[in-house]
Amino acid sequence: MYESIIPFPDETASTVDKYCCSHSTSLPPLFADHAAWTVDKFQTSYMMCCPLQAQMCVFLASDRRARRVLEIGTFTGYSALAWKEGMKAVGGEVWTCEAGPRAIAASKEAFAKYDPEGKIHLVEGPALQTLREINAGPFDIIYVDARKAEYIEYVEIILERHLLAENGIILADDTIHLGLVADRSSTNPHSAREDIEYSLQHADNVYKFNEWAVKHPQLDVLLLPIFNGVTLIKIKSQT
């Protein structure tokens, strides 16, 4: 279908999301339990990826036979658990970094409960510091979901330190940001949000990253209008 980006009203989008989840390989029960716990404990639970996105993470890690995943931004550990699930056949490991004290405490609790094998390694501290110091790579998948103003620096360090494995892939999350990177007019209902100034600041940072990434001579980039925008990045072939 040539006009392939189909907008749904909220009610239809919710129904379509449930349909997609039910027609994708299901997640183990621990994901529903941990999501419910996060919603109960955190007013900012919207920062957690949705079940369908977790299903995507599991699928990608499994399909690519990943053995090492680096996650920039842990929150309560939901997506880290998804990456681990996708690598269970090969015994892969996840390194996930987080700076927020509440998120660190929550993710520690989650990993103690759901990762008794110790396959998930929580790295505490700012993401930029972690990227400059981590020596566990190279990584088959690097998932970026932290401070939008630092996205460019994250990828620069990844390239500089050769943290991405050969044929590895970077996923940058939230790269459409409510559609505000492309449309800030009144036709976008999010342009009337109460927190519009905050949202526009995020959109500005994401816009700069998108422009930088697509023009980078070393990178192949695919920006997809799924979830809140997901950008797939790989290093260009040298042949």
Curated annotation (Swiss-Prot):
Specify whether S-adenosyl-L-methionine is a keyword of the entry. yes
Named from the GO MF annotations, one term is: O-methyltransferase activity
Keywords of this entry: Methyltransferase, S-adenosyl-L-methionine, Transferase
Residue numbers binding S-adenosyl-L-methionine: E71, G73, T74, S79, E98, A127
Is Transferase among the key words of this record?
yes
What InterPro entries does the annotation carry? Cation-dep_OMT, SAM-dependent_MTases_sf, SAM_O-MeTrfase
Instruction: Give EC number(s), comma-separated.
Output: 2.1.1.-
A Pfam family the protein falls into: Methyltransf_3
- Which superkingdom does the taxonomy of this entry point to? Eukaryota
Biological process (GO) annotations held by this record are:
methylation
Q: What EC class does the entry list?
A: transferase
Q: In which pathway does it act?
A: Secondary metabolite biosynthesis
Q: Report which reactions are catalysed by this protein.
A: NK13650 B + S-adenosyl-L-methionine = NK13650 D + S-adenosyl-L-homocysteine + H(+)
Recorded family membership? Belongs to the class I-like SAM-binding methyltransferase superfamily. Cation-dependent O-methyltransferase family.
Its annotated function is as follows:
O-methyltransferase; part of the ank cluster that mediates the biosynthesis of NK13650 C, a highly modified cyclo-arginine-tyrosine dipeptide. Within the pathway, the cyclodipeptide synthase ankA acts as the scaffold-generating enzyme and is responsible for formation of the cyclo-Arg-Tyr diketopiperazine (cRY) from L-Arg and L-Tyr. The ankA product cRY is desaturated by the cytochrome P450 monooxygenase ankB to yield a dehydro-cyclodipeptide intermediate.
Q: Quote the protein name from its UniProt record.
A: O-methyltransferase ankF
Organism annotation = Aspergillus thermomutatus (Neosartorya pseudofischeri)
